[in-house]
Amino acid sequence: MHFSIPETESRSGDSGGSAYVAYNIHVNGVLHCRVRYSQLLGLHEQLRKEYGANVLPAFPPKKLFSLTPAEVEQRREQLEKYMQAVRQDPLLGSSETFNSFLRRAQQETQQVPTEEVSLEVLLSNGQKVLVNVLTSDQTEDVLEAVAAKLDLPDDLIGYFSLFLVREKEDGAFSFVRKLQEFELPYVSVTSLRSQEYKIVLRKSYWDSAYDDDVMENRVGLNLLYAQTVSDIERGWILVTKEQHRQLKSLQEKVSKKEFLRLAQTLRHYGYLRFDACVADFPEKDCPVVVSAGNSELSLQLRLPGQQLREGSFRVTRMRCWRVTSSVPLPSGSTSSPGRGRGEVRLELAFEYLMSKDRLQWVTITSPQAIMMSICLQSMVDELMVKKSGGSIRKMLRRRVGGTLRRSDSQQAVKSPPLLESPDATRESMVKLSSKLSAVSLRGIGSPSTDASASDVHGNFAFEGIGDEDL
């Protein structure tokens, strides 16, 4: 997650108290909470008490006198670095002390009282699930409530996550972010003050081998089936006409497991697709559509001749990655109308091992760059867990009154309608040469053999590679 403190505000104290400086903490470019220096100092002291001073990053010291504007700016920069360092630390960033501080601050900033509400959560096929939660319930609480409503077993809850999405005019979802443990889902979605934003339940893992665990349960099977049918209908999963015919036949027979087994062999099964954006590969300002899955980033692009191409970057070939944000300045008459100082430009850049001795930076410019980075990190985490022989199955950390809250009534996952005929305008992708030759490339109907991806966040899954592997 991308933490920043891009601005400060001078605010009046409660009941006519003295004015103070508030620091606006943004997560992924959106205001999360507004806090005072004293609140952050209290957080720092609590973390120091629990973990020791040696573990913590430097915290800006107290000042005896009022700060000048220059000193306020300096403190803002120092607090921003502090919050980023704490969040990036595996111990501190996942601590309940840090996360509960952010949850309380979010609720206080949005001035949302603690009360019971009905929250709408969508399944991948658009089916609505209404759950009764508290406005102060954190992400895991809401996920448990949804699982209870669907009668999903406790040991399968960790295979699914809640995502904040924006519903576009055509009904498609544009993914904003995966909801995290430091936020309150009800507050997160309502604070955006737009009916376009929704919360969606979707599987949270990338390796299709984990499907076997989920498919053994009736509810888990139905959730995977509904998500897969939806992804095919949206064109996220790439199918040929013959594959589509086979899938429809299995769907008519209600052979859900066999349907999923066939879908697992298809290109882009289980991938998350992003909105159209721009990359500097294979050439500058190249329009692309990015998808993440199967330990890779896939870039679909159209080169001269209007042929649709695909390049795949394996996460194990990415040495590191970074997300940067900037505010472009208008350049006289050449700047487009409405494009000004307030528009934030986000970029995901990763250093990719093109050949044994050649690393190259690839940059993707997209409002969803942070979400792409989160996907890369989760793919790396999953690879490392699998490499160490661990399991992604998560045990629930908390219980309410010793047991999970269960809804009085369960809700079944509705079977989606039969697949429609494949879009005749969909084009097959052909392999590229020259500049793209070092990247794994496929046509739509070709077998899913090699996959390629890249990363710059200090990638522990980065592997050495020889020319013969490319």
Swiss-Prot record:
Annotated spans, FERM-like: 115-432
Residues the record lists as binding a 1,2-diacyl-sn-glycero-3-phospho-(1D-myo-inositol-3-phosphate): R36, S38, K62, R75
PROSITE patterns reported in the protein's UniProt record: PX, RA
Disulphide bonds in the chain: none
UniProt cross-references to Pfam families, sorted A to Z: PX, SNX17-27-31_F1_FERM, SNX17-31_F2_FERM, SNX17_FERM_C
Annotated Ras-associating domain residues: 115-206
Annotated region described as PTB-like F3 module, given as residue ranges: 270-432
Membrane-related topology note: Peripheral membrane protein
Interacts with the retriever complex: annotated segments: 458-470
Effect of S433D: No effect on interaction with CCDC22, CCDC93, VPS26C and VPS35L
GO molecular function terms listed in the Swiss-Prot or TrEMBL record: low-density lipoprotein particle receptor binding; phosphatidylinositol binding; signaling receptor binding
Keywords in alphabetical order: Cytoplasm, Cytoplasmic vesicle, Endosome, Lipid-binding, Membrane, Phosphoprotein, Protein transport, Transport
Entry's Gene Ontology BP terms: aorta development; cardiac septum development; cholesterol catabolic process; coronary vasculature development; endocytic recycling; endosomal transport; intracellular protein transport; kidney development
Residue ranges constituting the PX domain according to the UniProt record: 1-109
Major place of residence: cytoplasm
InterPro entries named among the record's database cross-references: PH-like_dom_sf, PX_dom, PX_dom_sf, RA_dom, SNX17-31_FERM_F1, SNX17-31_FERM_F2, SNX17/31_FERM, SNX17_FERM-like_dom
Family: Belongs to the sorting nexin family.
Role summary: Critical regulator of endosomal recycling of numerous surface proteins, including integrins, signaling receptor and channels. Binds to NPxY sequences in the cytoplasmic tails of target cargos. Associates with retriever and CCC complexes to prevent lysosomal degradation and promote cell surface recycling of numerous cargos such as integrins ITGB1, ITGB5 and their associated alpha subunits. Also required for maintenance of normal cell surface levels of APP and LRP1. Interacts with membranes containing phosphatidylinositol 3-phosphate (PtdIns(3P)).
Subunit structure, as described in the record: Monomer. Interacts with APP (via cytoplasmic YXNPXY motif). Interacts with KIF1B. Interacts with the C-termini of P-selectin, PTC, LDLR, VLDLR, LRP1 and LRP8. Interacts with KRIT1 (via N-terminus). Interacts with HRAS. Interacts with ITGB1 and ITGB5 (via NPxY motif). Interacts with CCDC22 and CCDC93; the interaction associates SNX17 with the CCC complex. Interacts (via C-terminus) with VPS26C and VPS35L; the interactions are direct and associate SNX17 with the retriever complex.
Protein name (record): Sorting nexin-17
Native source organism of the sequence: Homo sapiens (Human)
Top-level taxonomy: Eukaryota, Metazoa, Chordata, Craniata, Vertebrata
